[in-house]
Amino acid sequence: GLPVLDALLPLDCALFRKSQPWRFYAGPTLALELSGSTAWLAGHANPAELAGFLSFCGCESAILDDATCSPPDGWRKAETLTVFGLPQAGLLPLPAVDEALWTQLTLCREASAARVAAALYPADLTRQADFYSELCTKRSRGRAVAWTLEQESAVVCTVGAYALCNGQAYMACGQTAEPLRGKGIGGRLIVEMANSLATEGLRPVFLCAPERVRFYTRLGFAKLAEYARYVPEK
């Protein structure tokens, strides 16, 4: 199946098809999820019809596999998104970290949804509330996990797997507090989670923006596929 898309779309549709701000559409050859102003597409459709539909929906970006899905007419590629996962050899060695700092941190594998949301979206209360609701809904059904590193009860690093579905674990929202970046704690946490998910029989996958490709390659993750993010021509 398609990495990321085959985890995210079916799970979100099953849990949120009657919920705002999600909208889902399925045609004979296309599955489409709208979340906020971003569309996720799997399959293919007529490019002119797709452009009209996305415009009608107020969509500002679309993530798709342009090897199989022609982009909407009048849209341009904004960036290539790399899909990463574990290499065929299996689990990754834990990367180097500032050991003195690491020993001060507490790993929480059942992190508070409210605290994860606040750490990720401190200035956006609406996004914070949406994220909190989504995480609680998924986690109560065993479909998501969120980990944090905490220092004196403050969340300083987090990563999660926010769609456990169809044998995949879609990892996202890795973030380290600004003062502690560059010390290796984010990379260590991401590798630990990916290895843990793999030992549970899941296939960890995640999408990576161009500026982060070197970081994940250095950690030892393998490129599995490429998707593209398209935006309307202004």
Would you name each region that the model predicts?
Residues 31, 35-100, 105, 208, ...:
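Acyl-donor-binding surface of acyltransferase catalytic domains
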Residues 127-175:
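A conserved beta-strand-loop-helix scaffold within acyl/acetyltransferase catalytic domains
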Residues 1-9, 80-84, 88-131:
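Short amphipathic alpha-helix that is part of the acyltransferase structural core
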Residues 2-61, 156-172, 177-178:
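Conserved donor-binding loop and adjoining core beta-sheet/short helix segment
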Residues 72, 215-217, 221:
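Conserved active-site tyrosine of GNAT-family acetyltransferases
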Residues 171, 203-208:
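Conserved hydrophobic beta-strand within the GNAT/NAT acetyltransferase core sheet
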Residues 46-53, 172, 176-178, 182-199, ...:
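Conserved acetyl-CoA-binding loop-helix of GNAT-fold acetyltransferases
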